[in-house]
Regions:
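Class I S-adenosyl-L-methionine-dependent methyltransferase catalytic core
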Residues: 1-196
Protein backbone atom coordinates (compact mmCIF):
# COMPACT_ATOMS: atom_id res chain seq x y z
CA UNK A 1 0.00 0.00 0.00
CA UNK A 2 1.56 3.35 -1.00
CA UNK A 3 2.30 5.87 1.67
CA UNK A 4 0.63 9.22 1.34
CA UNK A 5 2.89 12.13 1.97
CA UNK A 6 1.39 14.83 4.07
CA UNK A 7 2.08 18.37 3.11
CA UNK A 8 2.69 20.76 5.95
CA UNK A 9 -0.04 23.42 5.55
CA UNK A 10 2.47 26.21 6.23
CA UNK A 11 4.70 24.93 3.42
CA UNK A 12 1.74 24.71 1.05
CA UNK A 13 0.72 28.27 1.98
CA UNK A 14 4.27 29.54 1.37
CA UNK A 15 4.45 27.87 -2.07
CA UNK A 16 1.06 29.06 -3.34
CA UNK A 17 0.08 32.50 -4.56
CA UNK A 18 -1.03 34.66 -1.63
CA UNK A 19 -4.71 35.51 -1.49
CA UNK A 20 -6.48 38.52 -0.06
CA UNK A 21 -8.33 37.42 3.07
CA UNK A 22 -10.73 40.30 3.77
CA UNK A 23 -12.50 43.31 2.33
CA UNK A 24 -13.70 44.11 -1.18
CA UNK A 25 -11.04 41.95 -2.90
CA UNK A 26 -11.42 38.97 -0.56
CA UNK A 27 -10.44 35.64 -2.11
CA UNK A 28 -8.50 37.14 -5.02
CA UNK A 29 -5.01 35.73 -5.65
CA UNK A 30 -1.89 37.80 -6.26
CA UNK A 31 0.70 37.27 -8.97
CA UNK A 32 3.48 35.30 -7.34
CA UNK A 33 6.71 33.52 -8.16
CA UNK A 34 8.21 31.48 -5.32
CA UNK A 35 11.57 33.03 -4.58
CA UNK A 36 13.77 32.75 -1.50
CA UNK A 37 13.88 36.57 -1.35
CA UNK A 38 10.11 36.70 -0.84
CA UNK A 39 8.40 35.53 2.37
CA UNK A 40 4.70 36.36 2.15
CA UNK A 41 3.17 37.03 5.54
CA UNK A 42 1.11 34.03 6.63
CA UNK A 43 -2.66 34.44 6.37
CA UNK A 44 -3.24 34.12 10.12
CA UNK A 45 -0.58 36.75 10.88
CA UNK A 46 -2.06 39.10 8.27
CA UNK A 47 -5.55 38.53 9.71
CA UNK A 48 -4.26 39.37 13.20
CA UNK A 49 -2.48 42.44 11.85
CA UNK A 50 -5.65 43.83 10.30
CA UNK A 51 -7.66 42.96 13.42
CA UNK A 52 -5.20 45.22 15.28
CA UNK A 53 -5.25 47.97 12.64
CA UNK A 54 -9.05 47.94 12.43
CA UNK A 55 -10.60 51.00 10.82
CA UNK A 56 -7.28 52.86 10.61
CA UNK A 57 -6.90 51.36 7.12
CA UNK A 58 -9.94 53.27 5.86
CA UNK A 59 -8.80 56.22 3.77
CA UNK A 60 -5.14 55.76 4.73
CA UNK A 61 -2.15 55.66 2.40
CA UNK A 62 -0.64 52.19 2.81
CA UNK A 63 3.15 52.08 2.50
CA UNK A 64 4.35 48.49 2.15
CA UNK A 65 8.11 48.56 2.75
CA UNK A 66 9.87 45.36 1.63
CA UNK A 67 6.70 44.60 -0.37
CA UNK A 68 7.59 41.21 -1.84
CA UNK A 69 4.30 39.70 -3.01
CA UNK A 70 2.43 42.83 -1.93
CA UNK A 71 0.04 40.81 0.24
CA UNK A 72 0.03 43.42 3.01
CA UNK A 73 -0.48 46.47 0.80
CA UNK A 74 -3.15 44.82 -1.37
CA UNK A 75 -4.91 43.64 1.80
CA UNK A 76 -4.91 47.26 3.01
CA UNK A 77 -6.45 48.41 -0.29
CA UNK A 78 -9.08 45.69 0.00
CA UNK A 79 -9.92 46.94 3.49
CA UNK A 80 -10.37 50.58 2.54
CA UNK A 81 -6.95 52.23 2.09
CA UNK A 82 -7.20 55.02 -0.48
CA UNK A 83 -3.97 53.96 -2.19
CA UNK A 84 -0.85 51.88 -1.67
CA UNK A 85 2.83 52.50 -2.24
CA UNK A 86 4.91 49.34 -2.64
CA UNK A 87 8.67 49.50 -2.05
CA UNK A 88 10.57 46.64 -3.68
CA UNK A 89 14.21 46.43 -4.79
CA UNK A 90 13.98 43.20 -6.81
CA UNK A 91 12.86 44.28 -10.29
CA UNK A 92 11.12 41.01 -11.33
CA UNK A 93 9.14 41.08 -8.06
CA UNK A 94 8.26 44.75 -8.65
CA UNK A 95 6.90 43.75 -12.08
CA UNK A 96 4.71 41.11 -10.40
CA UNK A 97 3.34 43.81 -8.08
CA UNK A 98 2.30 45.85 -11.12
CA UNK A 99 0.68 42.74 -12.67
CA UNK A 100 -1.24 42.08 -9.46
CA UNK A 101 -2.48 45.68 -9.41
CA UNK A 102 -3.72 45.32 -13.00
CA UNK A 103 -5.39 41.93 -12.41
CA UNK A 104 -7.14 43.29 -9.29
CA UNK A 105 -8.23 46.45 -11.13
CA UNK A 106 -6.52 48.80 -8.65
CA UNK A 107 -3.60 50.04 -10.78
CA UNK A 108 -4.85 53.63 -10.48
CA UNK A 109 -4.44 53.38 -6.67
CA UNK A 110 -0.99 51.73 -6.69
CA UNK A 111 2.53 53.09 -7.01
CA UNK A 112 5.53 50.76 -7.10
CA UNK A 113 8.85 52.31 -6.06
CA UNK A 114 11.79 50.17 -7.12
CA UNK A 115 15.02 50.44 -5.20
CA UNK A 116 16.40 49.80 -1.75
CA UNK A 117 14.05 51.22 0.89
CA UNK A 118 16.95 51.17 3.37
CA UNK A 119 18.43 54.10 1.42
CA UNK A 120 15.37 56.27 2.09
CA UNK A 121 16.83 57.88 5.23
CA UNK A 122 19.51 59.41 2.96
CA UNK A 123 17.21 60.17 -0.01
CA UNK A 124 13.58 60.18 1.10
CA UNK A 125 11.34 60.12 -1.98
CA UNK A 126 8.37 62.44 -2.25
CA UNK A 127 5.48 60.73 -0.50
CA UNK A 128 1.90 62.01 -0.32
CA UNK A 129 0.90 63.56 2.99
CA UNK A 130 -2.77 64.33 2.32
CA UNK A 131 -3.94 61.39 4.49
CA UNK A 132 -2.48 59.41 7.40
CA UNK A 133 -0.08 56.65 6.50
CA UNK A 134 -0.41 53.00 7.38
CA UNK A 135 3.23 51.89 7.21
CA UNK A 136 4.14 48.21 7.12
CA UNK A 137 7.76 47.26 7.79
CA UNK A 138 8.08 43.53 7.22
CA UNK A 139 11.67 42.94 6.05
CA UNK A 140 13.65 39.75 5.78
CA UNK A 141 13.80 38.90 9.47
CA UNK A 142 17.59 38.67 9.57
CA UNK A 143 17.78 42.42 8.82
CA UNK A 144 16.99 43.13 12.47
CA UNK A 145 20.24 41.31 13.38
CA UNK A 146 22.43 42.02 10.33
CA UNK A 147 21.34 45.64 9.65
CA UNK A 148 19.81 47.01 12.86
CA UNK A 149 21.16 50.55 12.31
CA UNK A 150 19.65 50.70 8.81
CA UNK A 151 16.31 49.37 10.07
CA UNK A 152 16.09 51.92 12.90
CA UNK A 153 17.18 54.76 10.57
CA UNK A 154 14.39 53.82 8.13
CA UNK A 155 11.82 53.71 10.91
CA UNK A 156 12.98 57.08 12.29
CA UNK A 157 12.93 58.75 8.85
CA UNK A 158 9.45 57.47 8.05
CA UNK A 159 8.09 58.49 11.46
CA UNK A 160 9.52 61.99 11.02
CA UNK A 161 7.96 62.37 7.54
CA UNK A 162 4.58 60.80 8.39
CA UNK A 163 1.45 62.94 8.60
CA UNK A 164 -0.38 63.17 11.95
CA UNK A 165 -2.50 60.13 12.79
CA UNK A 166 -0.23 57.66 10.97
CA UNK A 167 0.15 54.06 12.16
CA UNK A 168 3.28 51.91 11.98
CA UNK A 169 3.35 48.10 12.02
CA UNK A 170 6.65 46.22 12.30
CA UNK A 171 6.87 42.45 11.75
CA UNK A 172 9.84 40.40 12.94
CA UNK A 173 10.44 36.89 14.15
CA UNK A 174 9.92 36.03 17.81
CA UNK A 175 13.65 36.38 18.58
CA UNK A 176 13.38 40.16 17.99
CA UNK A 177 13.11 42.28 21.14
CA UNK A 178 10.49 45.01 20.55
CA UNK A 179 12.31 47.10 23.18
CA UNK A 180 14.87 47.78 20.41
CA UNK A 181 12.28 49.98 18.66
CA UNK A 182 12.31 53.72 19.37
CA UNK A 183 10.26 54.43 22.51
CA UNK A 184 6.72 55.51 21.71
CA UNK A 185 4.07 53.20 23.09
CA UNK A 186 4.53 50.20 20.80
CA UNK A 187 2.28 47.20 21.36
CA UNK A 188 3.89 43.78 20.84
CA UNK A 189 1.74 40.85 19.74
CA UNK A 190 3.47 37.47 19.39
CA UNK A 191 1.93 35.34 16.66
CA UNK A 192 4.61 32.62 16.28
CA UNK A 193 6.77 32.50 14.32
CA UNK A 194 6.20 36.26 14.01
CA UNK A 195 5.78 39.16 16.38
CA UNK A 196 3.86 42.30 15.39
Amino acid sequence: MPKHSRTDPSQAEAASAPRIIGGSLRGRRLEFSPDPRTRPMKDRVRESLFDLVGTRATGAIAIDCFAGSGAIGFEALSRGASRAIFCERHFPTADLLRKSARSLGVEDRVEVKTGDVLLWPKRMPALPTDAPWLVFISPPWEFFQSRPGDMMALLAALRQAAPPGSTFVVEADTSFDPAALPPDGWEARPIPPAVL
